[in-house]
Amino acid sequence: MKRKHLKRVVAGAFAAVMARSGISFPQANVHAEEKGNELRLWYDEPTSQGTNILGAGSGYDTDEKNRWQQHTLPIGNGDMGANVYGEIASEHLTFNEKTLWTGGPSESRKDYMGGNSTEKGQDGASLKNIQKLFAEGKTSEATAACNNLLVGISNGYGAYQPWGDIYFDYKDITEKNATEYQRDLDLKTAISTVSFKEDGTQYTREFFMSHDDDVLVARLEAKGSEKLNLDVRFPSKQGGKTVAEGNDTLKLCGALTDNQMKYASYLTVKADNGSVTGSGDKLTVKDASAVTVYLSAATDYKNAFYNEDKTEDYYYRTGETDEALAKRVKETVDKAVEKGYKEVKATHLEDYQELFNRVSLNIGQTVSEKTTDDLLKTYKDGSASEPEKRQLENMLFQYGRYLTIASSREDSQLPSNLQGVWNSLTNPPWSSDYHMNVNLQMNYWPTYSTNLSECALPLIDYVDSLREPGRVTAKVYAGVESKDGEANGFMAHTQNTPFGWTCPGWAFSWGWSPAAVPWILQNCWEYYEFTGDTEFMEENIYPMLKEEATFYNQILTEDKDGKLVSSPSYSPEHGPYTAGNTYEHTLIWQLYEDAAKAAEVLGQDTELAAKWKENQSKLKGPIEIGDDGQIKEWYEETTLDSMKPQGADPAGHRHLSHMLGLFPGDLIAQKEEWLQAAKVSMDYRTDNSTGWGMGQRINTWARLGEGNKAHELIQNLFKGGIYPNLWDTHAPFQIDGNFGYTSGVSEMLLQSNMGYLNLLPAIPDVWADGSVDGLIARGNFEVDMDWAKTSLTKAEILSKNGGECEIGYPGIAKAKIVDSKGAEVTVEKVSEDRIKFNTTKGETYTMTEIPERPVKAPANASAIYKDNTAIVTFDAVANAEKYVVYASTDGTTYNKVGEVEGTEYKAEDFAEGTTYKVAAVVEGKEGEKTSKITPEQLAVTNKIDDRDSRIEYSSGWGNWGPQEGQYEKTEKYSNTVGDTAELYFYGTGVRVIGMKIQTAGHLIYM
């Protein structure tokens, strides 16, 4: 990648400017908490005393491990991370550096080649045979061959590793005597503090991770009669030896046993008005009023496929000696020590706040007096006030931005992984790796729209680095070869590591996913869409798009109808193996779309782009509608239940793979028919998910314009997917869900994927009054908005690149638009709800006098019928006085047939073929009508079990596992008061038959 790494240069230049200009620095005392700070996570007990909630999940099988993921507070600078426990007598931090990985090339794996198996792949012969079997209709044989041949190996995969632990063992503090305890993480400053009183002395600690100086800083203070007397320890999690070097420094250097990766770290302690001495593996502080600790770390990892003279591949090392690596790290610490605490902190705040302060959100939040864990608890049980709920929702939105800045900076060597940059386990769940069948993509969904585009650069770097090893995989498994200087195509699949692991997984059923590359390339292409940086796109993004589109030109095959299919295909992570499916074809369609657009912008590869468009038009599907009005997940699908795999139920599956053309893609929104079909599929998939699955659902419903539905999922996420430290849980902790939530909130407020700025497209009723500043739309437009009663009252648009701006909002053609000088802007009216106008780079345009938004249509409208009676049901609309019902016999002309005050309409003169629409009336004004409601014939069913897709479960329900002997995972259960199971039926009653477990639960029929 042709991009300058500016981190160290900028830091040095900024320090020099400050020295000359006489900028004043903060006082030397630690960060004081801001009163009335709605973006402060805070707690009144240490991690060791917090209450664990929800499940622990894989890997966190002890109370101590579980507390780390549920209660500790994360800080980071993109390359390093730490988690603060906030203990009283023995403070504890876990420490990470993002490149410390096992796996990859090593002395014991001299033939390492990224997991590829030439024996299995046979240079594409296996794939071609499988494609032939599918074409001949020999599905069983093809499936068996997929399982046997389109797989990689597992040896050398490795895992992200914890570096070590930092302890501050106080000699004069007794935990039981501490009072007025607080610990916090201030999202406005990226500083975590711990404070308490004991024996008349105020003890305060401050922790932050400086990006520009590349150090973790801890500032410990005592104000009162007592001084600081403590030991500082820094034990390794990798078997390395920590030794005191001189009187004030701990050195922890070594090499991983698995792959001989070198690592080096230095921790230096400076005391105010006291002494520091070193002995053995610790430093001892005596009689200090304050202590400052500086820590930095690095490895000899380098994301380079070849060594410098290209004599070795799968290299991934700098080639540094132990001494050179140690010297590099020691110099980093020494420079920070020389600058001193005040200047390092000032630099940190300047750097962090320039990014974080770009976006602010007001959705009616307050500043609750409750601790964050209590606030979460009351949100879950419903006792929190509405402004308190808004505080938590806003905090989680900004937390996602904070975690982005902390785990992925413009010069980070690697992107954020499954856990960002934080990990406490040597064998973390899923290796804390890079999963590319939703997780890595979701990590970067909010990056552009929430004004942090530079934080996406490590992802683009990383995807680019997959090309060299991916060409090996393309040759082994697809028979596509790139000779020296050629870029004929590369492959990568579900999971990746920092060591060019691009092979399929060691099981086809989760590990085969070549379309993961087109999917992750969407994230890369969006950098250009949002920034408009054509030069960067030409040098760094278009080559990847071009190579991958060229790859698909070579591996797509024709089916019997002459349509192009990607064979074999698999919809993550369930269902049959087929010749093409919606997941793969939607992503290939988007790849061709973006590659052709890039070629057009650059004026390059005209003939090649024409071929891409031709192949795009010949793709099977990509979107097909099934017999139940749903978007098919598999092209062989008829009704929703027709492809149900044995032992699984797609109705509640966590993945939404067939919805990628809706979000994050652009395809489904091109046709209203497809949008309505997407709603059918989403309803069928249910809201029953956790973690990233809930995050994906929030984004997808937001794209459908269903703000209240998206907010319902937000509520479910808080109730079943967030730990006390606001980390998302799958379970266990995975950071993607945090980013998915932040992206979802952004999508509810602003969308731009369809070529125009769609303002407040999915604003929920509970965010009735509010504002947002700093969101970014494609075309590099920065958007500020104010709204009242969910209606837009003012919008300011900063055109950062110039060019045409198109706006969508109900009635926007009647709005007044002026530039920064107050001059009225000439606009072109596309429709009553759409306008466009030319903009000047750097100019701000203000819209006022915007018509009030029409009352929203009732959500979740549906209907059933039996004989001549139809029942139409829908959700209530806030403050609705009544509802107007319309009917049509031709699906085009709708006439009013009745009014109801409740949320059910009964038609006793129903004729088959009749469809309905419903509108709410608020303050005498009739609102928008629902989409067409087609009644479904009531099926007479004597008995159904809990697997029936017509039963809608709230998010708290789960399935008993086979170890409990509960009917092979088919029995539903819930331990949460208030959980519901809904079944709409026509009849005289319903009887529920279940296990009798004393008085463990009961049902209330409504």
Which residues are covered by each model-predicted region?
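Aromatic-residue-lined binding/catalytic grooves and analogous aromatic/hydrophobic interfacial grooves
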Residues: 33-508, 528, 549, 585, ...
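Beta-strand-rich modules
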Residues: 907-925
